[in-house]
Amino acid sequence: MVVVMLAAEEPLASTPRRDMDCVGKANTNKKLVQARLPFKRLNPEPKECNEPKRTKGPVAPKCSEPSDQENDQDSSSISHHGPALVNGRGPLDCFMSRRKRSPLRSAPEATIDLTEDSNDSAKQQPAPPIAATCPLSEEKTKTSEGTTEPTIPLTEEETEKDEAEDVDALPLLDITQDSDTEEEEEEEEEEEEQQQEAEVSHGNESVLSTGSTSSASVIASSPEPSKSAPTTPASTSRINAANKVKRRSLKSVQEQEEKQRQRDEKERLKQEAKAAKEKKKEEARKMKEEKEREKKEKKEKDEKERREKKERDEKEKADKLKAKEEQRQMKIEAKLEEKRKKEEEKRLKEEKDRIKAEKAEITRFLQKPKTQLAPKTLASACGKFAPFEIKAHMSLAPLTRVQCEDSVLEDLDRYLAQPDSTLNGLKDWTGHKPRSSGPTRPRHSAQGDCVVITESQKADDGPDRSRYGRMKLLHFHDNYRPAYWGTWSKKSTHISPRCPLRLDKDLLDYEVDSDEEWEEEEPGESLSHSEGDDDDEAGEDDDDDDGFFVPHGYLSEGEGALEDEEGGDPEKQKVRQRMKAREWENELMSKGKVKVLEAVVRGCFWEGEKPLPDFLQPYAVCMLEPLSKDEASTPEQDASRQQRNEKLLTMLLPLLHGNVNSNKVIITEFLEFCRQQTSSPTESLLNTTESIPPRIHVRRIIKENAVYEKRSTFKRCCWYVHADVLARYSQEALPVPCQWSYLTSGANVTRDEHSGSQGNSPTTNSSTTPSNKRKSASSHSITKYMKKCGESEQTEAMETDGFQADTEDDEDDDCIIIGEQSGSSEQDINTSLPQTDRETEPMDTSASETAALALPCPTPATA
């Protein structure tokens, strides 16, 4: 039986795993070996091409050859171990890849003739070295290159077995990842096959001839190439077969150990990865627990701080409440002490009254008892009703409400005496409309705000309660302040009997606690040890007088005897005493009455009829005569005025430009400078009449030619003269801040001014005038009390008559408002002093300055 094996180009690289694990080697030529059993000779048919061809068609039928029991057994064993081919492809063909191989030199094929004498040495042909692709046998492959494979005499069954084992021994891709149990089963099957091979080889030894040549085994599929050995005789075939089986078993054991080692390594790596992962998880868990613990500790700390703060606040609040309660208790105790003192004083007073009453009982017989009328006499004299007094707020109803004529009354009497039977009284009664009468209380006209009071009119007993309302006592039980006693005439639109607890925020302010605003008056100076004794004694005397009060007109027995003896008229004396008694009663009653202040209207008084009363003289209106109008200005006056303004501006520029003071200080300094220039005999720039200009004129010049603002040239706000004005007067080189030597006190001198001056002003001695003394106190700058404003706010120009460093109250000091006429024109308003020429230029004045401009303004020299 001929067994043909088609070896792949790279059997170890056919699977993906072997392709990845192994290193690429040079392709080796595969050879087809034909083995002939005894009594059967086969002619070797060498392949033209080293590449084996695979048939895609059906497999050729087996040739019918005589077979024995051993061959049948071998074939059955081979068919049992190897699966049948389907369409010429085995189970491993799907894992093999076809690659285009480079043409290699053809290797000679070895033909083994088993019929020849076994004593002859087998003809050996050099076989090309087979390069193993497995990395585990790489070194062995390198050592075996260039050596020839030894041929071992084997039987056909052994050859087939070896080929089948070689095919089975090819490293395949572990697709299913078999478990350890399957691997053990495979190992057991391999051991059984090895035992069967050993038995078969032992049984064939008697059949095979000793001189036959053993067929060459295909070693291309073996992972480890065997070393070249000389052909042995037939007696050594059993040993070689045993060695081969042993080598293969050792190889499988090594592979299993390697696999086991790889599995252990993989398991170890897996365990290490798992341990690392567990360690990482444990660290993450510990970190998370640490964070949670820190968070919890922080939360507990915050909660503790919050609780401590709350307790501290509650404690402070409790202390405040306790202090407030103690203060309240002290006030209550003080009030109770005061009340106790008052009760003690009241008790002492009652004791004194009792003593006085006892004294009065003793001296009561001295007083003349008053005669009282008997009740019967009073009832008979007054009738059913006792007399009563009609007070100011009372009025009696009229006696007859319906005023009837006598004829009507007579008809009524006649009808009552003899009623008419023809008349239907019921119809008359139902059809008759009753007459209506006016109100019982007569109407009084409402009094106006102005009440005319004559000199002879007497004061009323009290205010008219119908007009001012009833007196009310408003007191709350939880208040310390005294109750309110007075009138309350306001009516609420929200509070009503149905809603007594509604809030009325229009009339009452519920946010303010009036009890907290109440402060008890401090006790006055105690006069109990100094003047109080005299007062008490005087009070006791008054009490005694009240107890033994004798009204005017009362004469004890024997008092009027002298007057009668002198010949006085007793009737006149009684009338005189009665009048004195009435005056005395009026005087006593007027002391305890409440009088209402009422407005007194007097007038009207017409002019020219009578001289005005003296009490109206303080309120008389002063009639002012209009001011005389000046003549219109001429061009010559305008030119002279313009020239004077230019001279003033020329003198004012060194003082004004770069000055940090207000216009009030600048004007005062400039006027003082002009005054000293006038007093100097050599330097007199102006006439005597025009020497000192008015303040308002200087103010207008400053307003027209300069602005008060902050620029980059200086860090503070100061006066800056317009650039065109400086260019017109050739004063562009004026320093900022100004270097003026001040003649007056109170000016705010900057730091740069202390270093020196440029001599822009005369070096005259500073003289203090009365006007400077008067204004020195009010000329202090308040800029040092002000905070610095922002850059954007400082760059804005400020009006000269608006915000200044000082309060401008010059007009109030120098000008007096006399009057103003609505019909006066602007020309009349702009009149000025006789010392200065009349201004023709219209001035920009506000409504408040209009009256001030119309009046003559005295200068500091004339003030």
Curated annotation (Swiss-Prot):
Positions of post-translational Phosphothreonine modification: 111
Renumbered residue ranges of the record's region Disordered: 1-353, 423-466, 513-579, 749-863
Compositional bias segments (type: Polar residues): 821-835
Positions carrying Phosphoserine: 118
Key words, A-Z: Cell cycle, Chaperone, Chromatin regulator, DNA damage, DNA repair, DNA replication, Nucleus, Phosphoprotein
GO cellular component: CAF-1 complex; nucleus
DNA damage in keyword set: yes
Biased amino acid composition, Basic and acidic residues: 42-54, 254-353, 457-466, 569-579
Domain of life: Eukaryota
Localisation: Nucleus
Regions of compositional bias (Low complexity) in chain numbering: 144-154, 205-237, 760-771, 850-863
Single Gene Ontology BP annotation: DNA replication
Acidic residues bias (residue ranges): 155-168, 177-196, 513-524, 532-547, 806-815
PANTHER family, per database record: CHROMATIN ASSEMBLY FACTOR 1 SUBUNIT A (PTHR15272:SF0), CHROMATIN ASSEMBLY FACTOR 1 SUBUNIT A CAF-1 SUBUNIT A (PTHR15272)
Biological function: Acts as a component of the histone chaperone complex chromatin assembly factor 1 (CAF-1), which assembles histone octamers onto DNA during replication and repair. CAF-1 performs the first step of the nucleosome assembly process, bringing newly synthesized histones H3 and H4 to replicating DNA; histones H2A/H2B can bind to this chromatin precursor subsequent to DNA replication to complete the histone octamer.
Family designation: Belongs to the CHAF1A family.
Protein name (Swiss-Prot/TrEMBL): Chromatin assembly factor 1 subunit A
Source organism (scientific name): Danio rerio (Zebrafish)
Gene: chaf1a
